[in-house]
């Protein structure tokens, strides 16, 4: 599966999400969380998102990068066989109900590795 270095700098269309309490609670419950900060809407401080919740708003941006695969030499079948190998998440503040987040995915690097091609995408919210 070849990756063309010309794809560096390519960005997917921005994805906009409005965060609501129900989504935050559903995510936390899906992880088996029981802490009130993730589930109790009556808390004076309100709900907070689980620290891994941002993957929810990143995923559609990642999928949006597949729309560019053909322009850089990947077939649709190859694009579907890609593997998410690693994830580095930096939170500058917690996500709260009512937040509107815009996520942008941009290819920031490609290289050949023993198992195949490797691509880095930066996801910014």
Where in this protein do the model-derived segments appear?
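Hot-dog-fold acyl-thioester-processing enzymes
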Residues: 1-84
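Hydrophobic beta-sheet segments that form the core/acyl-binding groove
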Residues: 82-125
């Amino acid at each position: 599966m070849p990756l063309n270095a010309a794809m560096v700098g390519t960005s997917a269309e921005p994805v906009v999400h409005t965060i609501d309490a129900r989504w935050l609670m559903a995510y936390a419950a899906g992880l088996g969380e029981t802490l009130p900060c993730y589930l109790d809407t009556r808390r004076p401080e309100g709900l907070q998102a689980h620290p891994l919740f941002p993957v929810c708003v990143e995923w559609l941006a990642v999928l949006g990068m597949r729309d560019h695969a053909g322009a850089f030499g990947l077939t649709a079948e190859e694009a579907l066989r890609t593997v998410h190998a690693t994830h580095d998440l930096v939170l500058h503040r917690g996500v709260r109900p009512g937040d509107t987040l815009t996520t942008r995915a941009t290819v920031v690097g490609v290289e050949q590795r023993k198992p195949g091609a490797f691509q880095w995408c930066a996801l910014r919210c």
